[in-house]
Amino acid sequence: MKFLEFLGKRPPAAAPGPAPAPASAATASERGHAAEDLALAHLQAAGLQLVARNYRTPGRGGGEIDLVLRERDRTLVFVEVRNRSHGAFGGAGGSIGATKQRRIIFAAQHYLRRLPAPPPCRFDVVLVQEQEPVQWIKAAFEAQ
């Protein structure tokens, strides 16, 4: 399913009010949540189970992990969801540089310290770009 189609199928707000804005007028936050919803649906259809969503480290300067999922073999998968409206400047994947990777790795290390025995894990990226199918990049980067 393509992102704009998915965004258009989101359920309306429970409170009565004006009609939902068309996909093109959605706020950045709404588009981000819709992209995460679409990525999650894609990963769950592949058999992964949601463990956490929008995990944030406490304090300033930390990181956030969009989705934490578990595979059938118990591998913990930290997922960064990237959303872009077009392919300019590298598209959805073009904004995952070294700084962003370090923040995700930092957040994952913080998350893993809470567990009694850290399982195998990896870092995936799901790219959601308007008018394109969802792209899932397994093991997109590694903790150094």
From Swiss-Prot:
Cite a single Pfam family from the UniProt record. Answer: UPF0102
Renumbered to this chain, region (Disordered) spans 11-31
* InterPro entries registered for this protein in UniProt: Restrct_endonuc-II-like (IPR011335), tRNA_endonuc-like_dom_sf (IPR011856), UPF0102_YraN-like (IPR003509)
Can you name one GO molecular function term for this protein? nucleic acid binding
- What family is it from? Belongs to the UPF0102 family.
HAMAP family noted in UniProt:
UPF0102
* Protein name (Swiss-Prot/TrEMBL): UPF0102 protein Veis_0630
Q: Which organism is it from?
A: Verminephrobacter eiseniae (strain EF01-2)
